[in-house]
Amino acid sequence: MIGGLFLNTLSFVIVSNHSIVNNTANVHHIQQERVIVQQHQVVSAITQNYYPEFSIAVLFVSFLALYRSTNFKTCVGILMFKILSMTLLGPMLIAYGYYIDGIVTTTVLSLRFAYLAYFWYVNSRFEFILYNTTTLMFVHGRAAPFKRSSHSSIYVTLYGGINYMFVNDLTLHFVDPMLVSIAIRGLAHADLTVVRAVELLNGDFIYVFSQEPVVGVYNAAFSQAVLNEIDLKEEEGDRTYDVS
């Protein structure tokens, strides 16, 4: 197929219709009604046979328009492919006669781009289009996709160490974690601060950002024996010896 990704449903129906008409042009007048009925059935069958191809075209373009990734390089590659699809591939399909595929590809991608461009205009950040999302979190000027929880509450957890945390593919260093804040912009609008820094056994930290203060953290990952061992080590470390 030249210049196209999918089968053109309309072109196959038209070609099949013409071939059937040419083959039945010299049929006797008595059998004409029967031939017309057969012709209608064949064209309908051909149209139904190419419905899956048209559905695949729509699903693929919809998937491409909505697909998002957290990797920066992957997002750049997908964005470039979308731009080429809207400006080059779509018009090429229309020029070669694949009207359905070309119109669907260009229309769906253009509508998605226009929808995200609104958030780009309101917040003055191009990352809405780059990450293909309507909600972003900004950590000291660095943008990353924001993932909502299952019950739509707004909070963020970032993994890191004693003086750094990972924001998507970036590493943010800080002196005091209490000075780090997160701004949620887009469909959701919120400002989050660090409410809890959870230290793990390996020395790493999980930083919890929320609008509500954390009352406590329940530790359910350790058995009672491990907890007793940790308490004993802490007691030994707190002992002081008087040497005279």
From Swiss-Prot:
Transmembrane segments: 46-66, 75-95, 102-122
Residue ranges constituting the CoV 3a-like viroporin CD domain according to the UniProt record: 135-214
Pfam families (alphabetical): Corona_NS3b
Residues of the CoV 3a-like viroporin TM domain: 41-131
Any one GO CC term of the record: host cell membrane
UniProt membrane topology term: Multi-pass membrane protein
Signal peptide: none
UniProt-annotated location(s): Host membrane
Family, per entry: Belongs to the coronaviruses NS3b protein family.
Protein's UniProt name: Non-structural protein 3b
